[in-house]
C-alpha cells in the first residue's frame, strides 16, 4: 500500500503553448533529444541567458517516457537542504508517513519511467549531485536532464554544452521579437546591417537580444547600436512572468558572477 499520492502535479509544460516562437537551435534540439535517448543523465550547460531552459523544454517534449517529463525549477531555492522538498513539491507528492523526502522520492521513482528536469541547479550542485546519483542508482526507469552553468560531476553524466546563437539565428530572433513590439517590423536593407552588428555585439545571447528588441518601440536599431556602450543600463525590462534572474542583462550576468564567489 502506498503512503503517498500526487497532489496538483506539475508536469513539464507543452512547448506548443508557448507565447513566443522558438527560433533556431534545430541542430541542438536534435542532438539533445538524441542524448536523452542514450544517456540516463544529461547535463545541459551554458552561460546565463543563452536559452538552456527553453531548449530543455523542447527536447524533453520529444522524449517519450511512459509517465512523462517533470520539471523542477530550482533557481529560487537557496538552501541546499530544501532541494529534495522542492522535487517532492514539483511532483505533487503528498506523504502521510513523515518519511524523509529522499525516501519518498526513491519509492516514487523505483518502478516508474519518466524524465526529471532539474532547472537552475548550479548554486545547489552538491545537494543535487547527491540526490541525482542516488535516484539513478535505485530507479532504473528514471532519466534526468539537469540544466545549469556547470556539470553535476555524477558518474555516467553526459555533458551537452550550449553555445550562443549563430548570427543568422540571432538576427531572426531579434526580428521576431521586434515585430511583437513594432507591428510590421522586418529585416530590410535599411536595418539589416545594424541588427546584425547589434546581435554580434550582444554575442548572440538570446536573453540580451530579446531585451534589446523590447526597446525597439522607443529606439531604432541604429540608435540601440549607438547606445550599446552602456548595455547593462540600456537593456532594462523583460516580461513580467520571466524568472527574476532574467529581468535584466545586469541581473543575468550578476547571477553568473555570484556562482564564482567562494
Enumerate the predicted regions with their spans.
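Aliphatic-rich helical/repeat scaffold segments used for oligomerization and domain docking
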Residues: 1-262
